[in-house]
């Protein structure tokens, strides 16, 4: 049985117990949300996960970190180090999005070492294999769509991005649209190119039941990818984006009927004033399914600092109901991220998630804020460092300019906390 099917039958799995303990909630709440499809617990039957996560309504906002190779940069050891650093700094899941080297070796290695759920985009493999065989990136068969999904499932992948909403109708609309950037989703572009070349419907959409059968066999959580997401704030919230969303909303019900866990992916470039509308619409059309957002970025002019823009958009999106934030690194739109980029990206998105949790009244988040306040009151630096996301940076800065008494070198003898303590 899938986690959803177990939940519907009143069965509480070990993973449900673990996430309930982590969230600080009764396991019955976990079971109920999973049964309703308002939360997902990504866990392939073949993958042993030490730190499972629950994503959805009523739970803490989660953060995903993308890693993976690219042409000219295909070191397995570097990707393993990226994974290690991402997890160390608080990533709740990883996605392996490699497009060069031995993709299966890399994927299996990350799944084997990862204590958290691992996701992927299977269609990349089809395109990469075609390119490496000196063919066009869309020169693969309809059968390849599903063969790659099975291969990823057999390798222990817990959740998969499937761009099922890129239909012929949606594609026709995008061709005549006034968008500046027509398609910016790599998976969406590959599928769109295949559809145009072969003059066929998207196999993932046309044969969605076959996809559901595979997902159910392995208990793969389907992340319905938004292949028509806007790639710039000037293109945000247009007809193409929402038409695809309506397709995805219809498929949520079909997945639930089959007992397959499902979530919706959302736009990555959204002006701040449209974030609330986008999140609420996704929740409504998706019948309360969890929402997985890339960012979102509320400006396109932050190159080199896109992780900061991402944190701003992500915090607001999380407050309005987004459940899962995909990080963005300082290298976004520029180059393949290195290990340091991964660290910076995870910290920025974790800040956004924490800000959202506090604003939403998450009990655990507020308890940690109280601990930090008390540590500051008591000048308990070690506790402050331990509660901080960037504890190594915080400690380094403190030690670089030390102060011999209570407080720090910012205020010295004029520390407000110390003065108030002395004269109160």
Swiss-Prot record:
The keyword Iron-sulfur applies. One of its GO terms (biological process) is thiamine biosynthetic process. It comes from the Bacteria. Keywords: 4Fe-4S, Iron, Iron-sulfur, Lyase, Metal-binding, S-adenosyl-L-methionine, Thiamine biosynthesis, Zinc. It is an enzyme of class 4 (lyase). Substrate binds at residues 66, 95, 124, 163, 185-187, 226-229, 265, 292. Zn(2+) binds at residues 269, 333. Its EC number is 4.1.99.17. Its cofactor is [4Fe-4S] cluster. Pathway: Cofactor biosynthesis; thiamine diphosphate biosynthesis. Belongs to the ThiC family. Catalyzes the synthesis of the hydroxymethylpyrimidine phosphate (HMP-P) moiety of thiamine from aminoimidazole ribotide (AIR) in a radical S-adenosyl-L-methionine (SAM)-dependent reaction. This is Phosphomethylpyrimidine synthase. It comes from Thermotoga maritima (strain ATCC 43589 / DSM 3109 / JCM 10099 / NBRC 100826 / MSB8). The gene is thiC.
């Amino acid at each position: 049985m899938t986690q959803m099917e177990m939940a519907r039958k009143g069965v509480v799995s070990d993973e449900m117990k673990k996430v309930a303990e982590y969230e600080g909630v009764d396991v019955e709440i976990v079971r109920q949300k999973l049964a309703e499809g308002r939360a997902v617990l990504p866990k392939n039957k073949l993958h042993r996960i030490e730190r499972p996560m629950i994503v959805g309504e009523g739970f803490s906002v989660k953060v995903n970190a993308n890693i993976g190779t690219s042409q000219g940069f295909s070191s397995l050891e570097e990707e393993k180090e990226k994974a290690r650093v991402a997890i160390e700094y608080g990533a709740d899941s990883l996605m392996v999005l490699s497009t060069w080297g031995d993709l299966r070796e890399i994927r299996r290695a990350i799944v084997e070492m990862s204590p958290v759920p691992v996701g992927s985009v299977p269609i990349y493999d089809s395109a990469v294999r075609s390119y490496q065989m000196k063919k066009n990136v869309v020169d693969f068969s309809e059968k390849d769509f599903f063969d790659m999904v099975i291969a990823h499932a057999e390798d222990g992948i817990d959740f998969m991005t499937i761009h099922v909403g890129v239909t012929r109708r949606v594609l026709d609309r995008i061709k005549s649209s006034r968008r500046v950037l027509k398609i910016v989703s790599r998976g969406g572009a590959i599928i769109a190119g295949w559809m145009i070349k072969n003059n066929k419907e998207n196999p993932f959409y046309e044969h969605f039941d076959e996809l559901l059968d595979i997902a159910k066999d392995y208990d793969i959580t389907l992340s319905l990818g938004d292949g028509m997401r806007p790639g710039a704030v000037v293109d945000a919230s247009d007809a193409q984006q929402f038409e695809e969303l309506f397709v995805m909303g219809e498929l949520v019900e079909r997945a639930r009927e089959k007992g397959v866990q499902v979530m919706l992916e959302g736009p990555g470039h959204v002006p701040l004033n449209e974030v609330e509308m986008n999140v609420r619409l996704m929740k409504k059309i998706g019948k309360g399914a969890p929402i997985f957002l890339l960012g979102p970025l509320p400006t396109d002019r932050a190159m080199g600092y896109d992780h900061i823009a991402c944190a701003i958009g992500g915090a607001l999106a999380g407050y309005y109901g987004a459940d899962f934030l995909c990080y963005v690194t300082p290298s976004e739109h520029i180059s393949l991220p290195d290990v340091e980029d991964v660290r910076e990206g995870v910290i920025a998105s974790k800040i956004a998630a924490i800000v959202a949790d506090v604003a939403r009244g998450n009990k655990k988040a507020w308890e940690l804020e109280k601990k930090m306040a008390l540590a500051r009151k008591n000048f308990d630096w070690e506790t402050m460092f331990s509660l901080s996301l960037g504890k190594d940076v915080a400690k380094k800065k403190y030690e670089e300019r030390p102060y011999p008494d209570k407080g720090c070198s910012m205020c010295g003898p004029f520390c407000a906390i110390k003065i108030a303590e002395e004269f109160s």
